[in-house]
Regions:
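Short His-Asn-centered micro-motif
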Residues: 49-51, 71
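Extreme N-terminal tail/first-helix region
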Residues: 1-21, 144-146, 156, 162-163
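C-terminal edge-of-domain segments
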Residues: 112-163
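A short, well-structured catalytic beta-strand-centered motif of the EAL phosphodiesterase domain
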Residues: 36-39
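Short active-site oxyanion
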Residues: 42-47
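A short, Trp-centered hydrophobic/proline-enriched beta-strand micro-motif
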Residues: 12-27, 66-70
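Short, structured beta-strand-loop surface elements
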Residues: 56-123
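Positively charged, polar, low-complexity stretches
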Residues: 30-34, 57
Length: 163
């Protein structure tokens, strides 16, 4: 992975996986929760629809650096993004990223309890796994028969500046 290809790979993963664990630091320490990411790579922004009654606003007021973790266990891809966060009230943005499933929690994007969290990625760490599950199982079985170490390929960890 090189330069823009690195960032492109990060955005591809975020777009494909969608759900992440978002971690904030508040007055009572770290707090993580699953949220659905709404990435906008052209704006270098990951949007989240949140509830204004949650503790995220207070936590971001204490420390606006957040952590986002995306995992694809089947492909052995693990992505951690450090981002700067801000709470936003913008009905146009809420409407543009609104999905039908959001209606399970709110009465549309104009619901007064709908808030937006804007995450601007600063840097990302990507652990790109060596192989698919099938290859890993094959290599494990082969190593059990031959006694040799399994050939699982290269396990790469790369830190990418996202600014």
């Amino acid at each position: 992975m090189k330069g823009e290809d690195d960032a492109g790979r990060i955005w591809d993963i975020v777009e494909r996986l969608g759900v992440c664990m978002l971690t904030t630091r508040g007055s009572r320490g770290l707090r993580a929760r699953p949220l659905e990411a709404r990435p906008d790579r052209n704006a270098n922004t990951i949007w989240f629809i949140t509830d204004v009654r949650s503790s995220k606003e207070e936590e971001i007021a204490v420390d606006n650096e957040i952590g986002l973790v995306f995992i694809d266990k089947d492909e052995s891809v693990y992505l951690a993004i450090a981002a700067c966060a801000e709470e936003v009230r913008d009905r146009d943005v809420a409407s543009s990223i609104w999905r039908t499933t959001d209606n399970m929690w709110w009465n549309g994007p104009d619901d007064p309890n709908v808030g937006l969290l804007r995450a601007i990625p600063l840097r990302a760490e990507l652990w790109d796994g060596p192989s698919s599950k099938a290859v890993m199982v094959f290599e494990f079985l082969k190593s059990q028969i031959s006694g040799a170490k399994p050939n699982l390929g290269e396990n790469r960890k790369k830190t990418i500046n996202m600014k």
